[in-house]
Amino acid sequence: MSGFKRPSPRAATSAAVVSCLGLAATLQPAHAYRPFDGTDAAVAKEGEMEVELQPAGASRQNGQTTLIAPDVVLNFGLSKQWEAVFEGKLETPLSPSGPSSLTSAGAFLKGVLREGSLQDKSGPSIATEFGVLFPETQGDSGFGASLLGIVSQRWDWGTIHLNAGTALTRDHHGDIFLGAIVEGPSKWKVRPVAEVFYEEEFTQSHTVSGLVGAIWQVSDDLSFDVGLRHAITGGHQVNEIRAGLTFGFPLRAGSSVGRNETSRK
């Protein structure tokens, strides 16, 4: 996405954390849920860190193939209802070749405004995410900002996450984003997932995107994901493959690992 991204693996040493943060700098919302562009209405538990990592992925647009490696999102649980999110990815053109660029970098705050089905309570879960978009190393050199609203509802048959957001892009254009994520039953070890979204960068271009994939929930603090995405951006086709993992660990002794919900499984 171009204004909101920015989906929770865990690192084991402070050196790994610093390395991931260095990687965290196109415009997109703070995606905090792999392998989607949107996110869910849940946050990391207080005192814990979640890491969303794509070791390698690829996209193809206008006859050019780009390696996306790595793509990193770090989620720090600040309190029961709030987390800090840092993200970024490295893009390297392969054909034709070109210099690598640090893109989609940003820093965000995400908060649960209403606890609901994702927190093992009744009704929808409602959250917001807002923050700053950092300049790209090879692209737009300005700063931007984004604001996103999220509503999630879980049933026995599956889960739906609705996203609506607005942004000021790095080149200072207005941007809106509307998306929906659908997941299979949370009790399934491997659940099918899908996402559709529409994004409009005013006076520039609009994007219609669809993704299908699967999430393998190994445990509460470890999952693997894969997704295939097809989009039309400014009249041009974009094809992308995503594969990664999400893991987590406590930043202090004695904490349990997971999100402030009944887990995504």
Show where each model-derived region lies:
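Transmembrane beta-barrel domains of Gram-negative outer membranes and organellar outer membranes
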Residues: 30-265
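Cleavable N-terminal export/targeting peptides
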Residues: 1-35, 252-265
